[in-house]
Structures are given as C-alpha cells and as structure tokens.
C-alpha cells in the first residue's frame, strides 16, 4: 500500500470512529439540549441537533436533506480525486484531505441515519456562544487549516527553488 493510502486509511478510520462514538455516547446519555459544563464560562457538552449546515445554514430549506447529501457526495468525490493526484511526499496534504473526508463522512452518516447532525461541543465566553459543533466539524476545520499551511509551505519551497 502506498504511504499516502495508509495515512488516508488510518486517519479517516480513527477520526470517523471518534466522531461516531462521541455522537452515540452523547445521544445515549444526554437529553436533547442538556448541557454539562466542562470548563465553566468557556466550554460545555451540550446535546444539540442541527438540520442545516454550519451555523444552521439552510435549516428551514424543504429539500435540505437530499441537498446536503448530494453536496457531501460531490465533495467526497472531489477529495478522493485530489487525493489520488498527491505525490508520495505530500504527507501533510494526505492527512489534511483525510481529515476533511472523514468529517464529511461522519456528518453524512448522521444526515442519512437521522436527517440531521448531532452537535455537542459548545464553546462560549460568558453569554457569547459559538454554534455547537462535533468531532466531524473539527476534523474538517483542522484539515482545511493544515491544507492551507501545506499550500503555503509548498509555495515557499517552490519560490525558494526558483
């Protein structure tokens, strides 16, 4: 197995297992909207359901479920195509795309199974709350940040070589 495919398999599997296990744990142990402070004034575990996308975007759109499923499948295909084009030395890009892919799959599982996504990570400062999110959302954000860093690093390396 090529190194990047090994990375993809491991990162995707680990991220997906953590995402689904935490969602199952929250769903089985908390009531909807129940909140458990972890770091008072900063972070709680709060069981929420999100019918939309980030920040509940399109949560009232009638065809949101098939729309989000279709968009996710297209994104997953684009990630897979991009991944296949990576060189063996592009390990950070491989990790990045794996995280983004696993996050997409994690939220897709929720949408197909429940028609909505389980969110539970609640970050806030006093009365100002960031929208609740989950491990899949975190994987996507970290993956995008790492991919941006990898692109900057590659650009600097190429300009240095020229």
UniProtKB/Swiss-Prot annotation:
Xref: PROSITE patterns: SPASE_II
Protein EC: 3.4.23.36
GO biological process, alphabetically ordered: proteolysis
Primary site of residence: membrane
Active-site residues, as the UniProt record annotates them: 119, 137
Record flagged with keyword Cell membrane: yes
InterPro entries: Peptidase_A8 (IPR001872)
Keywords annotated in UniProt: Aspartyl protease, Cell inner membrane, Cell membrane, Hydrolase, Membrane, Protease, Transmembrane, Transmembrane helix
Record-level Gene Ontology MF annotations: aspartic-type endopeptidase activity
Entry's Gene Ontology cellular component terms: plasma membrane
Keyword Transmembrane helix: yes
Source domain of life: Bacteria
Membrane topology reported for the UniProt record: Multi-pass membrane protein
Name of this chain's protein: Lipoprotein signal peptidase
């Amino acid at each position: 197995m090529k190194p990047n495919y090994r990375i993809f398999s491991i990162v995707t599997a680990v991220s997906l297992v953590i995402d689904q296990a935490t969602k199952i744990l929250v769903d089985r142990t908390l009531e909807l909207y129940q909140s458990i402070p972890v770091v008072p004034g900063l972070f709680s575990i709060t069981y929420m359901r999100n019918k939309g996308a980030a920040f509940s975007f399109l949560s009232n759109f009638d065809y949101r479920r098939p729309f989000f499923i279709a968009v996710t499948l297209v994104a997953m295909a684009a990630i897979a195509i991009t991944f296949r084009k990576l060189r063996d030395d592009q390990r950070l890009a491989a990790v990045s795309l794996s995280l983004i892919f696993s996050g997409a799959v994690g939220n897709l599982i929720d949408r197909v199974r429940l028609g909505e996504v389980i969110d539970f990570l609640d970050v806030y400062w006093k009365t100002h709350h960031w929208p609740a999110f989950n491990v899949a959302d975190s994987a996507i954000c970290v993956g995008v940040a790492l991919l941006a860093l990898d692109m900057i690093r590659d650009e600097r390396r190429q300009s240095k070589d020229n």
